[in-house]
From Swiss-Prot:
The protein, known as: Methionine import ATP-binding protein MetN
Enzyme Commission numbers on file: 7.4.2.11
Topology of the protein relative to the lipid bilayer: Peripheral membrane protein
Gene Ontology molecular functions: ABC-type D-methionine transporter activity; ATP binding; ATP hydrolysis activity
Organism: Staphylococcus saprophyticus subsp. saprophyticus (strain ATCC 15305 / DSM 20229 / NCIMB 8711 / NCTC 7292 / S-41)
A GO cellular-component term linked to this record: plasma membrane
Length: 341
């Protein structure tokens, strides 16, 4: 388990102090994939560097598997860092070394014999899908292949924790999905704890179990991914979710919808099994409503599906609308009134 207790990171400059991380508390379960999402300057990259002590916190404790990182001796800290590996946005490969020799590099530093290092590297080459490219140089690889080398190198010392700092930000969408699938596979096979820093909610949705949203150095919202997508609380979180679901039904569009006195435009949010149920059919049959679908989308998460549906319909009175709303919410479909005639 990884625990962050009241973590603060402050930088002093000539003009002012910069509070990069502001009293953050987090608990990350062993064997889980935990995402931290935020816009540029939110403090997320600083936060991840505190986990392996590349940055030292101004105050607070980082505890990994029972060890308080800031209290370890230099030799114990070096050993701990071997078990907390990291991959980066721009790969950080050694351009004068082949794929195989990039992977053996941390093993050489750790004093592993050349034969064992080569054997372990060959196994990792196969694991990340680069068999046949062992003798290639980074300049001969695509972006996705470079990141696969970075992942293999990070796994060389058999870590228990893998930190991913914007690891897919430089990749195209298809390659991003391939790298995410690889991380899922590695996590399952090696029982890794993975912490992912990103500004892409798509990444969070695809593979994370839990997510923390950061703004101005603070964690402003956190929880299970499905819960955060279903019911985001903070405006920043709502923006991330809206962008990922391609929900562009804003007030300017809703103004184009002509409504009579008894008309409603509502947004229905659903997750899990509800995302694949014939909801419109249910509404028309159960509540005898003529439904006009204005917008809809469904996306897939690691644990199921999430989505929204924006519809227009007319009801005779407010009591019937409340009956409709209560019925759907009893089935775990949230109902939000966008506009009322």
């Amino acid at each position: 388990m990884i625990e962050l207790n009241q973590i603060v990171k402050r930088y002093k400059t000539k003009k002012q102090d910069v509070l990069a991380v502001d009293h953050v508390d987090l608990s990350i379960q062993s064997g889980s994939i935990f995402g931290v999402v935020g816009f540029s300057g939110a403090g997320k990259s600083t936060l991840i560097r505190l986990l392996n002590h590349l940055e030292q916190p101004t105050s607070g404790d980082v505890i990994i598997d029972g060890d308080t990182i800031g209290k370890l001796s230099k030799s114990d800290l070096r050993k701990k860092r071997q078990k907390v590996s990291m991959i980066f946005q721009h790969f950080n490969l050694l351009w004068s070394r082949t794929v195989l020799n990039n992977i053996t590099f941390p093993l050489e530093i750790a004093g592993i014999s050349r034969q064992e290092a080569k054997q372990r590297a060959l196994e990792l080459v196969e694991l990340v899908g680069l068999k046949g490219r062992e003798d290639a140089y980074p300049s001969e690889l695509s972006g996705g292949q470079k990141q696969r080398v970075g992942i293999a190198r990070a796994l060389a010392n058999e870590p228990s924790v893998l930190l991913c700092d914007e690891a897919t930000s430089a990749l195209d969408p298809q390659t991003t999905d391939e790298i995410l699938e690889l991380l899922l596979k590695i996590k399952e096979e090696r029982n890794l704890t993975i912490v992912i820093i990103t500004h892409e909610m798509h990444v969070i949705r695809r593979i994370c179990d839990e997510v923390a949203v950061m703004e101005n150095g603070k964690v402003i919202e956190q929880g299970k991914v499905s819960s955060v997508f279903e019911n985001p609380q903070h405006d920043v979180t709502k923006r991330f979710v809206k962008d990922d679901l391609n929900d562009d039904f804003d007030e300017s569009i809703s103004e184009l919808v002509s409504l009579n006195e008894n008309d409603y435009v509502v947004r229905l949010n659903f997750t899990g099994n509800n995302a694949t149920e014939p909801l419109v059919s249910y509404i028309t049959k159960t509540h005898n409503l003529d439904v006009n679908i204005l917008e809809a989308n469904i996306k897939h998460t690691k644990d199921g599906s999430i989505g929204f549906l924006i519809i227009q319909f007319a009801v005779a009175n407010s009591e019937k609308f409340e009956k409709f709303k209560n019925d759907l919410e009893a089935q775990h479909v949230s109902v939000e009134v966008v506009k009322h005639g």
